[in-house]
Design a protein with these regions (language model features):
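HIT superfamily nucleotide-processing domains
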Residues: 2-179
């Protein structure tokens, strides 16, 4: 097998209403593919045969980590097959454990699958500094945040906003259920 034949890139097919990625040669314009191929620098912290984890060069907190499959896959997590998603989540879980154990004051790590910065499937891990006091679950609230987003602004936020109206929530639930 040639080196290029061993690299992968998604080609979409439709299966059960979902776009499922199939394999074809790597995207040479993809920064993550270039990192995998050691053609671009990165601060690697973990890898196995199929996945790679490296520190984000644009962290919003110390230790933000990107976990990727080494094979190029579409960036929208739900466009990928179950095997690919589950394998990535297992890799992310392994790396999150490393962050929890090795970063002072980190007891939990958050994960998102945003997929807009680079068109290559990836999980972003966010060490939650200040959660590593050794105790079991404790509630941490995001009080005083009333920012509501009508549309995506380039980042995700998990803060609570103002209490939503139950009639509006019921209408939204019916819409999502297709009623």
């Amino acid at each position: 097998m040639t080196e290029e034949a061993g690299r992968l890139l998604p080609r979409y097919s439709h299966a059960g209403g979902f776009r499922v990625a199939e394999n074809k040669p790597v995207d040479q314009d993809c920064i993550f593919c270039r990192i995998v191929a050691n053609e671009s620098p990165s601060h690697r912290i973990w890898e196995d045969d199929n996945h790679l984890a490296f520190l984000s060069i644009y962290p919003n907190t110390p230790g933000v980590t990107v976990v990727i499959p080494k094979a190029h896959r579409p960036s929208y997590v739900f466009d990928n097959d179950d095997e690919t998603v589950c394998a990535l989540m297992k890799a992310a879980r392994k790396v999150a454990g490393m962050l929890d154990q090795r970063l002072e004051g980190v007891g939990r790590t958050g994960v998102i699958f945003e997929g807009y910065g680079v068109d290559h499937l990836h999980a972003k891990l966010f060490p939650m500094h200040g959660t590593g006091d050794g105790s079991s679950f404790r509630r941490i609230e995001s009080k005083g945040m009333d920012r509501f987003f009508e549309r995506y602004e380039g980042y995700l936020s998990s803060h609570d906003a103002l209490r939503a109206d139950d009639d509006a929530l019921s209408a939204m639930a019916r819409r999502i259920r297709g009623e």
